[in-house]
Amino acid sequence: LGATFFYLWNAFSLNKHIMNRRSFFKNGSLVAIGSTIVNPFQVFAQQTDFDTLKKNKKAKNIIFLVSDGMSTGTLNMADLFLSRKTGKGSHWLQLYKENRVTRALMDTASANSIVTDSSAGSSSWGGGVRVPNGSLNVGANGEQYLPILQKFKQAGKMVGCVTTVPITHATPAGFCVNSKSRNSQEDIAGQYLDLNFDVMMGGGNQYFAADKRKDKADMYAKFAAKGYQVAKTRTEMMSASNDKPVLGVFGEDAIPYYIDRNNDAELQKTVPSLAEMAQKAIDRMKNHPKGFVMQIESGKVDW
């Protein structure tokens, strides 16, 4: 699914010109929505051949792909956009059509609401326990649950997160830390320093820079002192060695949308894409004998 995810999101960046609305919806596109891609989890429902998937083999590496805030409607529109602009639909939906993926639905209610938020959702997905909205791996009575990336780090694997929002934001943090509040992002940055994860990249300069933090702590200097390569531009990230851990922070808050980045030559030079961050993270960790576990998040889908 790794290639699927990148293809879906990069699809929006391949074209710098926005088609007009009439052209987008003409020639039966609305019929296509109603007949073929209304719900990709229901259409093409065939029984998966688990023998073909070699279910008894153990995975060495695990990549969690998070499209935060994406509904099936978002996926449908991506497929429609690609069909109109490139003449072929999304690779993701093609996997459904060919029955090459195992798919499922889950109840995402948090411990205190039928409507979850990113922190509770990430905590339950990664840690297996429902927690109240707003908290990160902390239960209603203060119970602390070990985050999934800490478990894998203890097991000897390399671990990391890359995202288009602040690296201290709820979804990556839900795989990494314990915190009563998802809003404690300065504290979360400090926890990352103690965890010694191998790759952490996204936005969030305001939670690392001394002149932005309330406590005036220079988190960049602290990470560098622990042996991290600190990257603040695309060039610095691309030139970083694969032999040392990497902290990459490429925006004050979130990094720009693809459509904005790809229409701005300066942003293209200075800000890496999610695909580029993910590839750099994989290159950093892929040769580790015990493998790696990584979360890749497209975090601004519903912003």
Predicted features by range, described:
Residues A32, V43-K244:
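N-terminal catalytic scaffold of extracellular/periplasmic and nuclease hydrolases
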Residues L1-I18:
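Short, Lys/Arg-enriched N-terminal segments with co-localized hydrophobic residues
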Residues S23-A45:
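N-terminal export signals
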